[in-house]
């Protein structure tokens, strides 16, 4: 597949010869030349790349050499396109051009012959025209007028004034950029008067204005602003070039015809439209015209469905379609999408987005990430679609909160996504048609508008307000007007405002109108405002009818239905409009002025109005002018608020007395005058007068005591403390302000205590009496209510009655009232304050009692009866939700019956039908009957009837009143618990009822039935336990089990408890810390015969795929003899402790007659700490609900598994882990036949079981189980003193299982965290986890132990007897285990005790002990011998290897059974191994993530190729005895002093040589001034002098213009250079798709191979803010260890240039493709050392026979010498290989334009380029091919600037002249000892100079870095080491000595080697 599409013609052309192609191309060249010549003058302006793309897509030609600057090049190009391309094809010489400069006319005449007769009609319209046109035309002073009288205003307009006299009728005109200034009337008048035949005109108008856009949607082309009715247009966004035009000037965009007043018709056609530039044709005559018109494209999309969840419902979003789709696809393709990646992708696509686009993309990406997908086409998700669309009916602010709606909107938006287009329906315009209205989103304030002034000039306040006019300056005190005209006169809006005015003026508190609409309008018409009367007079009957509709639909009658409930429907009688309060004198004055204007009723400043009641009798005009307003002088008004009375005994409200208010003084500020009932009336007729509180505001708001729902303060004259059940009050004294307050408000001064309370909203107090002992009995109580409203209730034998208290009022409950009545408060408003004044009892007679005060008294012990049901008010109820679970029931009016049904099991209809027959007295029959109707609330009658009829006592927790109500009927045996809150009943269930539920599940009954029986059988004590919500004890469960005859098997951890074993009902229960659950029938069957297969718990093969891949599958047939031997030992008690016949009454376990069946066992083996158990636990918890049995030989391991199960309960639930078991090995044998068939059986630590255990288990459990064995055969095995004589000689199960079997063994341990363990144990360690640790500690003698040290907390010993020693010396706190006991355990630090007995311990136990510790291990020598002796005793044992660091992995093979295959980690077949890998790596660099493919790589099977293995020739190598110091003595005198070697620049000095020892705690091999590191210069990035030296030598600077010119001059040489190269290397030009894909993959794989942290640290290079043509220059930090750099002075550094990642990602894949194409055809005689190993180089060198004189070449400043000739060769090479032309152009741009902070570079090569090594190598090859006379038999190797040939090369003079042009100059060397890339070449192979390796090894020692680099140095030495004796022939004496020291250092440090190179040195011995 080609990189770019080519048409068939293009494909054929590529097959022609170049000469034929040139012939065909000549025609195209001529055409291009002609076209460029004709159009260059018009399209020569330099435009941005983005604009160039859009203009080209719009069909506008742009010169390829457009370099002329212009202030607004894009709009100028568009103007030229229309004027010089479009218009000339339409017009002819008969046209007159209007409003155009002469040079443009002359240009058209000269260019187009048919326009040589055109002429211009210019005139002065604006002041700028005098400059634009000059004085070269004549204006007529006077002409004959063709206009009629009605045209007088038009002909005098500036636009037409000078034009019309010069235009003849029937002429043809072209108006240049002028029509958008003409108004519609001017255009119609001009067409009517002048009657032109054709009128062409250009219009500049952004079409997006037609859809309300307030900003440009093509900002690259133009920008604009809308200010009032003006459009400010800025071409190319340049404000200095902007101009102003009418906002309505775009009416032609929506016009198809123009109808003239004289009935003439003109047709309007849009001939050309490019963005904001349009060409219109207006032709005379009535012909067919289009009906619709569309404009585009725009950088925007239609908002579509997203408008429904967006603020303001926008029409579009300013982002292009392809951008949105690319970002959407990109985020949907990521496994872990994030907003950073989305913004990076957006920045990659759009280089300079606007702020709105950035904001949209940020929020749009967040929507994509947090919103899932929805299927709407195939298998649609109809339910989600339905509910999602349902939410779209809501406002956007609510719809956006619904997840389903967001999903539907996003899905529809993407599905229907389309670019924004402005579609308009064309209209016919006339002189009187409505002008186009352009609405934008602009919300700017109008200039010159004083809003306060306009408010004042409305109907209210203008004539009466006395204030200085001032502009609006911020938040000023506003006045709330009920009536004001806010809009200009517009009938529809006027009617809406009139409706609101009518409702506000004429509605009372029930929504009832106090007058009809006609009557209101008649009254309104009497106002003095002329404007108002004029507006009202305009209303017709139709308008009044419309007003009625508006009022009826928008303002329906409303009332507080929730408060009145059913009484709302019965509400009759007087309705009263609420009073409203006069705030201040100014308000009063303004209201008076309004009253006078509206109703011609004067009102004085001291008058107060209140509305009289008006009865609604159904008439249409209930208005009465005499009683509508009733003025009452303020000075004579008595201030009495109006209470509303509600009697609960009757459903209807009491009639309210509306008598006339008596006159009384009313001087208090804020006082209120209300009309109506003036007393708190009790049901018995008692009346308590209510009076106002004139000075309520003088109170002190201080409430320090917090109560439930209110705050309080207690005041007393006698300083008494007030205590009660809910708390207590400290006395606040009797302050002065309180005394004055009582005097001012007329409160009797005999009261000596007061409780002040401030309520919250909906506060309440139950019925109570103020008769506490602290107060005087029979004394009156005075109550004050302020700052809010409340319902005050009274209760006596006659019933209950409530009175609503509003405002600041007070009254007194008379003497004796507390003994005969009770009172209550409810429905308090927030902030309502009550003062309760009382009299204290005498001090000697009173006592402090724990009584509830007014706010807390709940009428304790109150009792009544109804229908024989006793109603008891019990103790207060608090914390209902803490002790009970609340069950939800519907709130449809039947909530009580729904709740009761939860206990009775009956439906609502059934219960109501039964109760209808309930016999009750005549008093309650009517009420009960009404309450049994559908959806009617239940009251006391229904509750008592249900209690008596259904036999259920009711316990109701009334949270609103705060107490518990009991409804009891004699003989009832059941009880229902209900909660009443907010007038809603809900059933309650005790929270901790797990015991009851578990019993209920076992007996198959409802929990309520069980609870009822339990309450009956167990009494009140059980009821109290249940209701406390704390659960019950186990002994209670035992009693319940007996009551219900349940045989309960209770699982508590690993133990089983049998309760009531003789019970009839069997049940399995599981008990945890605080919970009991029913698990069904017992999990284990009683007999194996009934153990049937259960599919839901059995595991299938597919459930175990992961386990089977990780393990080795072994076929095994259990041995009956081995099983019987172990069964015998278990039976006689010699093995185990649970299976003995003598001690445990167990029978013989060996099954008789059981057939032995072959079983597949998964074996998962690995070394210590490899993660066997952890891996299994991770996999097991994926087997939710399956049956798993974990078997362990150690109880501690079982406990650990149980802990993991408990942790998993939170995620998997109780059912998920129900069938998980952990058993010790004996319990597993006993229960094997009862396990579920198909269970997963895990045998952990397989090496620790007694021999024959596996056989016995397989025989007992059967072959249906899935078996997996874990363990490590190298660790502790089974050993028991009791059965050692019987089983000691029997081979263990793991050896029997794996005998002769090949299996995987994991040798990678992740346990160890200290480098102390490196090389001491036979395993691989995870190097990243190893931290530097202290050296190994060896303690001599038990007396040297530090018992306070960390290692003393754990000690391992070899026998049980040695535990006594540990206890004696370490103490009791030390955890002491034997080696065997520690199997499977891990500790951080600890010690190992070595005694004389330890030598008899097996190796398996020793390796177990040595591998138990993660961080540190300490050895304590208690063997009474020296460490040297111990080391010799244990020399060939694990302890000796540990001490000597000589442990090897191969030592494990001798201890393992079968044929182990060592693997590193648990490996499985990886399918899609790299899925998501790159995405995770690139999380820290979201920009780079957008540049690489994140796709999963296709899995390919590796083909194993058979390789021939030859035995290497080996001969003895003599290594002379030579010390390091003697080698150093040969050259130490060459090290000069530091001051002589460094370079100076002014006061700066380089820092390349050290004279101090390393700070890395390395070895001191020499004195600090002669360190090995001082041999070589070291470059550091912070060394300024070294960097400047590098810049001066290695970088060349120039400017892009010069470099581009030089490259253009060199390009003709490119084909010549390519031809010479192809002679030697015949590249294939055909494109190879697979090779290109592989090249791209290789680059991306290399780029993402770094760690995620490294990628994130370099993420700034991926950001678009880093310009692509700017590089970052820095010097490479390195130690220059080339042989030529030994003992030299300071040298210049190597410079590196960092490029933007976009540049690398652009070129790197193609450079790798070129490299693959090169290697594809590279002859074998040429070698390129790239991507190859040293072994391959070694083989090629041996084949090349590098003997005798060879040729080497080196270059001076190789990178800087890669000049324009080399780039010309590279460009021709890329074209030859068919690389895209745009890539080649990008490459040329980078090479010529690259710069940095230092300046612009010349054409050269940079280290850091994507193509550095490849093109360096190819330039080296090209230079070699041109410089030398090659015969064809030479073997030459290349690598960058290195070249070496196996013979003497002779210089050729053939290309001498051309070679002199190149900056590239070679330094040729003919030598007998050739080198290449630092390697010596010979016919025996390659080897490194020993001096270099030795000095590097010593430097590594000095810097403590040997462990990290010894592998590399060992590989370099190995080539000479493997040459054997032949290496000596290639070295001199100094080299041989250095080589010996290299080998010696490597062998002595062999334990540090981590690679396979260590095997080469295994036979080495150091004497």
From Swiss-Prot:
| Feature type site, description Cleavage | 1472-1473
Provide the cofactor list for this protein.
Fe(2+)
Q: Give all residue intervals belonging to the (+)RNA virus helicase ATP-binding domain.
A: 1133-1308
User: What is the species of this protein?
Assistant: Blueberry scorch virus
Q: Where does 2-oxoglutarate bind?
A: 832
Domain spans labelled Fe2OG dioxygenase: 750-841
What are the positions of the active site?
994, 1075
Where's the (+)RNA virus helicase C-terminal domain? 1309-1455
Domain of life, source organism: Viruses
Catalysed transformations (reactions):
ATP + H2O = ADP + phosphate + H(+); RNA(n) + a ribonucleoside 5'-triphosphate = RNA(n+1) + diphosphate
List, in alphabetical order, the GO biological process terms annotated in this UniProt record. Answer: DNA-templated transcription; mRNA modification; proteolysis; RNA processing; viral RNA genome replication
RdRp catalytic domain mapped to chain residues: 1748-1855
Sites binding Fe cation sit at 768, 770, 823
Q: What is this protein called in UniProt?
A: RNA replication polyprotein
The EC number(s) attached to this protein equal 2.1.1.-, 1.14.11.-, 3.4.22.-, 2.7.7.48
Residue ranges occupied by any Peptidase C23 domain in the UniProt entry: 990-1080
A Gene Ontology MF term for this entry?
A: dioxygenase activity
PTM note: Specific enzymatic cleavages by the viral protease yield mature proteins.
The UniProt similarity line reads: Belongs to the potexviruses/carlaviruses RNA replication protein family.
- Domain OTU, by residue range, is 884-991
Residues noted as binding ATP in the record, renumbered to the chain? 1166-1173
- What is the role of this chain? Protease: Thiol protease that cleaves the polyprotein.
Q: Which InterPro entries match?
A: (+)RNA_virus_helicase_core_dom, AlkB-like_sf, Alphavirus-like_MT_dom, DNA/RNA_pol_sf, IPNS-like_FE2OG_OXY, OTU_dom, P-loop_NTPase, Peptidase_C23
């Amino acid at each position: 597949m080609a990189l770019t599409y080519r048409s068939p013609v293009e494909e054929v052309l590529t097959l022609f010869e170049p000469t034929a192609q040139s012939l065909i191309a000549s025609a195209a060249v001529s055409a291009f030349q002609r076209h460029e010549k004709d159009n260059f003058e018009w399209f020569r302006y330099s435009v941005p790349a983005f604009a160039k793309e859009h203009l080209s897509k719009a069909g506008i030609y742009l010169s390829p050499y457009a370099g002329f600057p212009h202030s607004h090049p894009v709009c100028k190009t568009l103007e030229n396109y229309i004027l010089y391309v479009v218009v000339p094809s339409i017009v002819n010489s008969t046209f007159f051009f209007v409003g155009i400069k002469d040079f443009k006319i002359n240009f058209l005449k000269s260019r187009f012959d048919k326009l040589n007769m055109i002429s211009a009609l210019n005139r002065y319209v604006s002041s700028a025209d005098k400059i634009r046109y000059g004085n070269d035309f004549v204006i007529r002073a006077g002409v004959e007028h063709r206009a009629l009288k009605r045209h007088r205003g038009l002909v005098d307009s500036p636009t037409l004034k000078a034009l019309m006299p010069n235009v003849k009728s029937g002429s043809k005109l072209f108006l240049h950029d002028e029509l958008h200034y003409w108004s519609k009337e001017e255009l119609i008048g001009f067409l009517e008067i002048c009657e032109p035949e054709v009128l062409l005109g250009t219009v500049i108008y952004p079409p997006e204005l037609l859809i309300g856009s307030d900003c440009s949607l093509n900002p690259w082309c133009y920008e604009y602003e809308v200010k009032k009715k003006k459009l400010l247009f800025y071409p190319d966004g340049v404000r200095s070039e902007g101009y102003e035009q009418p906002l309505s000037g775009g009416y032609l965009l929506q016009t198809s015809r123009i109808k003239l007043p004289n009935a003439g018709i003109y047709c309007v056609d849009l001939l050309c439209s490019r963005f904001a530039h349009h060409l219109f044709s207006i032709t005379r005559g009535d012909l067919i015209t289009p009906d619709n018109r569309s404009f585009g494209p725009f950088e925007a999309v239609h908002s579509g469905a997203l408008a429904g969840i967006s603020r303001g419902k926008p029409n579009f979003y300013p982002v292009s379609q392809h951008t949105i789709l690319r970002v959407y696809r990109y985020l949907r393709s990521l496994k872990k999408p994030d907003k950073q990646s989305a913004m990076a992708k957006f920045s990659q696509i759009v280089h300079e987005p606007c702020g709105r686009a950035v904001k949209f993309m940020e929020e749009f990406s967040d929507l994509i990430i947090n919103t899932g997908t929805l299927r709407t086409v195939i298998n649609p998700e109809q339910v989600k679609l339905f509910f999602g669309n349902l939410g779209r009916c809501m406002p956007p602010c609510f719809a956006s909160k619904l997840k389903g709606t967001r999903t539907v909107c996003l899905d529809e938006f993407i599905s229907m996504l389309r670019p924004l287009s402005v579609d308009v329906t064309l209209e016919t315009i006339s002189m009187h048609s409505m002008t186009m209205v352009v609405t934008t989103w602009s919300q700017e304030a109008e200039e010159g508008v004083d809003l306060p002034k306009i408010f004042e000039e409305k109907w209210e306040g203008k004539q009466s307000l006395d204030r200085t006019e001032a502009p609006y300056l911020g938040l000023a005190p506003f006045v709330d007007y009920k009536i004001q005209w806010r809009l200009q006169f517009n009938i529809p809006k006027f009617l809406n405002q009139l409706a609101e005015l009518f409702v506000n003026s004429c509605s009372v508190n029930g929504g009832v109108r106090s007058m009809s609409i006609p009557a209101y309008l008649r009254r309104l018409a009497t106002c003095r405002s002329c404007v108002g009367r004029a507006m009202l007079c305009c209303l017709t009957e139709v308008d009044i009818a419309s007003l009625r509709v508006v009022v009826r639909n928008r303002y329906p009658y409303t009332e507080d239905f929730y408060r009145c409930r059913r009484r709302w429907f019965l509400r009759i009688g007087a309705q009263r409009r609420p009073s409203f309060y006069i705030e201040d004198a100014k308000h009063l004055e303004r209201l008076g002025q309004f009253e006078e204007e509206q109703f011609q009723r004067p009102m004085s400043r001291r008058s107060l109005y209140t509305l009289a009641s008006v009865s609604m009798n159904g008439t249409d005009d209930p208005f009465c002018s005499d009683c509508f307003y009733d003025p009452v002088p303020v000075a004579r008004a008595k201030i009495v608020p109006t209470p509303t009375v509600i009697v609960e005994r009757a459903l209807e409200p009491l009639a309210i007395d509306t008598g006339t208010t008596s006159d009384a003084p009313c001087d208090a500020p804020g006082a209120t005058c209300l009309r109506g009932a003036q007393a708190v009336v009790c049901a018995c007729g008692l009346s308590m007068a209510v009076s106002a509180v004139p000075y309520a505001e003088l109170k002190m708001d201080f409430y320090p005591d917090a109560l439930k729902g209110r705050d309080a303060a207690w005041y007393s004259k006698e300083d008494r403390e007030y205590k009660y059940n809910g708390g207590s009050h400290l006395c606040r004294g009797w302050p002065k302000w309180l005394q004055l307050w009582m005097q001012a408000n007329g409160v009797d001064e005999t009261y000596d205590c007061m409780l002040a309370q401030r309520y919250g909203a909906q506060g309440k107090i139950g019925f109570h009496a103020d008769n506490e002992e602290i107060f005087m009995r029979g004394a009156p109580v005075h109550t004050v209510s302020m700052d809010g409203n409340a319902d005050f209730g009274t209760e006596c034998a006659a019933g209950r009655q409530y009175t609503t208290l509003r405002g600041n009022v007070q009254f007194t409950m008379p003497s004796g009232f507390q003994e005969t009545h009770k009172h209550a408060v409810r429905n308090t408003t927030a902030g309502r304050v009550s003062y309760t004044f009382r009299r204290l009892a005498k001090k000697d007679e009173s006592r402090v009692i724990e009584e509830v005060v007014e706010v807390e008294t709940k009428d304790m012990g109150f009792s009544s009866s109804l229908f024989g049901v006793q109603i008891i008010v019990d103790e207060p109820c608090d914390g209902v939700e803490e002790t009970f679970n609340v069950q939800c029931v519907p709130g449809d009016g039947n909530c009580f019956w729904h709740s009761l049904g939860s206990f009775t099991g009956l439906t609502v209809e059934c219960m109501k039908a039964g109760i209808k027959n309930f016999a009750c007295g005549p008093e309650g029959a009517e009420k009960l009957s009404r309450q049994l109707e559908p959806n009617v609330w239940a009251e006391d009658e229904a509750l008592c009837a249900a209690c008596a009829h259904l036999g259920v006592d009711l316990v109701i927790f009334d949270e609103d009143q705060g107490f518990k109500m009991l409804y009891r009927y004699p003989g009832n045996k059941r009880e229902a618990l209900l909660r009443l809150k907010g007038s809603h009943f809900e059933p309650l269930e005790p929270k901790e009822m797990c015991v009851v539920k578990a019993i209920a599940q076992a007996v198959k009954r409802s929990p309520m039935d069980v609870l009822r029986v339990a309450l009956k059988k167990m009494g009140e004590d059980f009821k109290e336990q249940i209701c406390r919500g704390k659960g019950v004890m186990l002994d209670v469960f035992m009693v319940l089990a007996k009551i219900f005859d349940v045989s309960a098997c209770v699982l508590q951890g690993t133990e089983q408890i049998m309760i009531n074993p003789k019970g009839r009902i069997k049940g399995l229960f599981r008990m945890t810390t605080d919970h009991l659950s029913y698990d069904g029938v017992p999990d284990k069957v009683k007999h194996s015969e009934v153990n049937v297969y259960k599919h839901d718990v059995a595991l299938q093969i597919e459930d175990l795929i992961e386990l089977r891949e990780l393990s080795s599958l072994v076929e095994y047939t259990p041995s009956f003899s081995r099983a019987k031997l172990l069964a015998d030992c278990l039976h006689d008690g010699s093995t185990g402790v649970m299976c003995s016949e003598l001690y445990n009454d167990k029978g013989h376990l060996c099954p008789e007659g059981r057939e032995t069946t072959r079983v597949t066992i998964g074996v998962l083996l690995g070394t210590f700490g490899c993660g066997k158990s952890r891996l299994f636990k991770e996999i097991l918890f994926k087997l939710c609900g399956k049956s798993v049995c974990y078997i362990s030989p150690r109880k501690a391991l079982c406990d650990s598994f149980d802990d993991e199960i408990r942790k998993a309960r939170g995620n998997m639930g109780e059912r998920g882990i129900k069938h998980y078991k952990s058993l010790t090995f004996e319990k597993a044998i006993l229960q094997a036949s009862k396990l579920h068939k198909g269970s997963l059986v895990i045998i952990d630590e397989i090496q620790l079981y007694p021999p024959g255990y596996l056989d016995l288990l397989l025989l007992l459990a059967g072959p249906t189980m899935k078996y997996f064995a874990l363990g490590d055969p190298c660790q502790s095995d089974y050993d028991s003193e009791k059965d050692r004589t019987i089983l000691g000689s029997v081979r263990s199960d793991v050896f029997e299982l794996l005998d002769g079997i090949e299996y995987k063994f994991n040798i990678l341990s992740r346990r160890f965290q200290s480098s102390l363990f490196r090389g001491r144990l036979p395993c691989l360690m995870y190097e990243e986890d190893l931290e530097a640790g202290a050296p190994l500690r060896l303690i001599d003698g038990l007396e040297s132990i530090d018992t306070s040290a960390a290692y003393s907390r754990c000690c391992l010993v070899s026998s049980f007897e040695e535990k006594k020693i540990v206890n004696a010396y370490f103490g009791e706190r030390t955890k002491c285990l034997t080696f065997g006991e520690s199997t499977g355990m891990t500790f951080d630090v600890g010690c190992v005790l070595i005694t004389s007995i330890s030598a008899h311990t097996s190796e398996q136990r020793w390796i177990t002990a040595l591998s138990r510790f993660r961080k540190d291990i300490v050895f304590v020598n208690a063997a009474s011998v020296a460490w040297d002796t111990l080391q010799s005793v244990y020399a060939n044992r694990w302890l000796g290897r540990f001490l000597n660091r000589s442990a090897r992995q191969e030592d494990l093979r001798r201890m393992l059974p079968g044929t182990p295959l060592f693997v590193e980690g648990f490996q499985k077949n990886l399918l899609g191994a790299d899925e998501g890998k790159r995405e995770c790596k690139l999380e820290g660099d979201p920009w780079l993530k957008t540049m690489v493919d994140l796709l999963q790589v296709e899995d390919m099977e590796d083909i194993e190729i058979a390789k021939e293995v030859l035995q290497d020739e080996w001969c003895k190598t003599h290594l002379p005895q030579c010390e390091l110091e003697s080698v150093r003595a040969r050259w130490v005198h060459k090290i000069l002093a530091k001051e002589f070697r460094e370079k100076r620049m002014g006061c700066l000095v380089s820092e390349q040589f050290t004279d101090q020892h390393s700070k890395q705690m390395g070895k001191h091999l020499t004195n600090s001034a002669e360190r090995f590191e001082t041999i070589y210069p070291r470059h550091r990035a912070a060394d300024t002098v070294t960097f400047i030296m590098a810049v001066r030598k290695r970088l060349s600077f120039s400017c892009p213009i010069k470099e581009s010119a030089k490259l253009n001059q060199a390009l003709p040489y490119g084909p010549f250079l390519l031809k010479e190269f192809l002679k030697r290397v015949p590249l294939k030009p055909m494109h190879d798709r697979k090779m290109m894909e592989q090249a791209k993959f290789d680059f991306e794989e290399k780029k993402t191979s770094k760690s995620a942290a490294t990628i994130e640290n370099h993420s700034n290079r991926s950001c678009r803010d880093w310009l692509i043509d700017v590089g970052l220059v820095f010097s490479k930090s390195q130690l220059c260890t080339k042989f030529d750099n030994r003992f030299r002075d300071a040298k210049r550094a190597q410079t590196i240039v960092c490029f933007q990642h976009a540049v690398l990602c652009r070129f790197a894949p193609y450079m790798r493709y070129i490299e693959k194409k090169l290697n594809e055809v590279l002859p074998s005689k040429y070698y390129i050392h790239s991507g190859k190993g040293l072994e391959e180089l070694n083989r090629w060198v041996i084949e090349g026979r590098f003997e005798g004189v060879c040729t080497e070449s080196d270059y001076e400043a190789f990178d800087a010498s890669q000049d324009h000739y080399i780039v010309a060769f590279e460009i021709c090479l890329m074209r030859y290989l068919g690389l895209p032309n745009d890539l080649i152009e990008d490459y040329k741009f980078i090479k010529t334009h690259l710069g940095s902070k230092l300046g612009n570079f010349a054409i050269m090569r940079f280290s850091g380029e994507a193509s550095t090594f490849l093109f360096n190598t190819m330039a080296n090859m090209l230079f070699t091919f041109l410089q030398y006379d090659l015969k064809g038999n030479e073997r030459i190797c290349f690598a960058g600037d290195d070249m070496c040939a196996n013979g003497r090369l002779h210089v050729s003079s053939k290309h001498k002249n051309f070679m002199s042009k190149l900056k590239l100059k070679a330094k040729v060397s003919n030598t007998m000892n050739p080198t290449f890339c630092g390697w010596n070449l010979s016919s025996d192979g390659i080897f490194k100079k020993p001096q270099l390796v030795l000095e590097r090894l010593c430097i590594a020692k000095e810097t403590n870095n040997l462990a990290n680099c010894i592998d590399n140095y060992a590989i370099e030495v190995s080539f000479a080491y493997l040459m054997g004796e032949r290496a000596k022939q290639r070295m001199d004496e100094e080299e041989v000595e250095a080589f010996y020291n290299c080998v010696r250092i490597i062998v002595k440090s062999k334990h540090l080697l981590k690679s396979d190179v260590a095997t080469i040195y295994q036979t080495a011995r150091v004497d």
